[in-house]
């Protein structure tokens, strides 16, 4: 711990409360052994350093990405060199990237106001996404319907689009989830593109047509509305919910550590200031509970797919344990077929495997809860990229990402269609 205190002394108290990103950099650190992983892991839990780990230390074959505030760059780089840790700068000036992103959004908003058309190749506000959900439902009233499933901590509505041919009540269904981690904007953007793709391709594409003839699709494009709004108004890199934690000034919980699946186990924290804080109890976050209640009341979901970013991964249970899921062989086969279909568009390569051994242990996750509650076909996509931009994927990659992801999603849903249980 001595070296942590040493860095803290060098940095001093000037970084306290820093929310700006001028001169902040993202470093990629290549770890080679368990000792190096251990040293970096201790830094993850050192609040005074104000480091933001985008990719946490977990294994030798997985680099560590960390956002370093400008005031701590010199000290942190000195520490890395002193420990013989190799690193490279992947983002030179984070604020410059954010400024470009903001300029693009404002430009797009102006164009959309004048044309009254939704640009699927741009990032949008929560209100714009909800408005487009209304448009989709209005354009295809016999196929799509917007359904309110609950509300957020700050009382924002949570909407899903239900796609159904209307033949039967509580038919077999697939749940598509996105935006549970608010800063992962490519997931929300991919989800709303996917919504339009479903209605546009019905009765044109035999695959999606046959899927909807046999089962329904429920799509939640923004699973963490408060966090998403906060990323656009206060802190672009906010990950958690915006709930209050009694006894702590730190806000929110990680909604993907809050599900009742080995809750409070490995890969989650009991520290409210941690980005992987699991919350006071399972389903404490109203956003999570709304989904849980809806799915349990419905009672006939066969698939659950959660869209995240970044790293280009396609994973399945378990995250909370290294033990193999009973259906691991089938899930792995389906995931590899989906990854192959995805790669056929532009060659984007995805790594496939169970969450725990592919990235890191993660208790309380959505897909583990789904799987443990009888939803056999449970998968997580970590979308583009592998670290060049990380969570700040440029808008010109939205449509290419969505197009390739669609083939992966469709492959999984076809398997669900053909293997209902």
Curated annotation (Swiss-Prot):
<feature type="binding site">
    <location>
        <position position="124"/>
    </location>
    <ligand>
        <name>a protein</name>
    </ligand>
</feature>
<feature type="propeptide" description="Activation peptide">
    <location>
        <begin position="17"/>
        <end position="113"/>
    </location>
</feature>
<protein>
    <recommendedName>
        <fullName>Carboxypeptidase A4</fullName>
        <ecNumber>3.4.17.-</ecNumber>
    </recommendedName>
</protein>
<keyword id="KW-0479">Metal-binding</keyword>
<dbReference type="GO" id="GO:0005615">
    <property type="term" value="C:extracellular space"/>
</dbReference>
<feature type="binding site">
    <location>
        <position position="248"/>
    </location>
    <ligand>
        <name>a protein</name>
    </ligand>
</feature>
<comment type="subunit">
    <text>Monomer. Interacts with LXN.</text>
</comment>
<feature type="binding site">
    <location>
        <position position="308"/>
    </location>
    <ligand>
        <name>Zn(2+)</name>
    </ligand>
</feature>
<keyword id="KW-0862">Zinc</keyword>
<feature type="binding site">
    <location>
        <position position="181"/>
    </location>
    <ligand>
        <name>Zn(2+)</name>
    </ligand>
</feature>
<keyword id="KW-0964">Secreted</keyword>
<feature type="binding site">
    <location>
        <position position="69"/>
    </location>
    <ligand>
        <name>a protein</name>
    </ligand>
</feature>
<feature type="disulfide bond">
    <location>
        <begin position="250"/>
        <end position="273"/>
    </location>
</feature>
<comment type="similarity">
    <text>Belongs to the peptidase M14 family.</text>
</comment>
<keyword id="KW-0645">Protease</keyword>
<feature type="binding site">
    <location>
        <position position="71"/>
    </location>
    <ligand>
        <name>a protein</name>
    </ligand>
</feature>
<feature type="glycosylation site" description="N-linked (GlcNAc...) asparagine">
    <location>
        <position position="260"/>
    </location>
</feature>
<feature type="binding site">
    <location>
        <position position="196"/>
    </location>
    <ligand>
        <name>a protein</name>
    </ligand>
</feature>
<comment type="function">
    <text>Metalloprotease that cleaves hydrophobic C-terminal residues with a preference for -Phe, -Leu, -Ile, -Met, -Tyr and -Val. May function in peptide hormone and/or neuropeptide catabolism.</text>
</comment>
<feature type="domain" description="Peptidase M14">
    <location>
        <begin position="122"/>
        <end position="416"/>
    </location>
</feature>
<feature type="active site" description="Proton donor/acceptor">
    <location>
        <position position="382"/>
    </location>
</feature>
<keyword id="KW-0378">Hydrolase</keyword>
<keyword id="KW-0121">Carboxypeptidase</keyword>
<feature type="binding site">
    <location>
        <position position="123"/>
    </location>
    <ligand>
        <name>a protein</name>
    </ligand>
</feature>
<feature type="binding site">
    <location>
        <position position="163"/>
    </location>
    <ligand>
        <name>a protein</name>
    </ligand>
</feature>
<dbReference type="InterPro" id="IPR036990">
    <property type="entry name" value="M14A-like_propep"/>
</dbReference>
<dbReference type="InterPro" id="IPR034248">
    <property type="entry name" value="CPA_M14_CPD"/>
</dbReference>
<dbReference type="Pfam" id="PF00246">
    <property type="entry name" value="Peptidase_M14"/>
</dbReference>
<dbReference type="InterPro" id="IPR003146">
    <property type="entry name" value="M14A_act_pep"/>
</dbReference>
<keyword id="KW-0865">Zymogen</keyword>
<keyword id="KW-0325">Glycoprotein</keyword>
<dbReference type="GO" id="GO:0004181">
    <property type="term" value="F:metallocarboxypeptidase activity"/>
</dbReference>
<dbReference type="GO" id="GO:0043171">
    <property type="term" value="P:peptide catabolic process"/>
</dbReference>
<keyword id="KW-0482">Metalloprotease</keyword>
<feature type="binding site">
    <location>
        <position position="184"/>
    </location>
    <ligand>
        <name>Zn(2+)</name>
    </ligand>
</feature>
<dbReference type="GO" id="GO:0008270">
    <property type="term" value="F:zinc ion binding"/>
</dbReference>
<feature type="binding site">
    <location>
        <position position="125"/>
    </location>
    <ligand>
        <name>a protein</name>
    </ligand>
</feature>
<feature type="binding site">
    <location>
        <position position="127"/>
    </location>
    <ligand>
        <name>a protein</name>
    </ligand>
</feature>
<feature type="signal peptide">
    <location>
        <begin position="1"/>
        <end position="16"/>
    </location>
</feature>
<feature type="binding site">
    <location>
        <position position="197"/>
    </location>
    <ligand>
        <name>a protein</name>
    </ligand>
</feature>
<dbReference type="Pfam" id="PF02244">
    <property type="entry name" value="Propep_M14"/>
</dbReference>
<dbReference type="GO" id="GO:0042447">
    <property type="term" value="P:hormone catabolic process"/>
</dbReference>
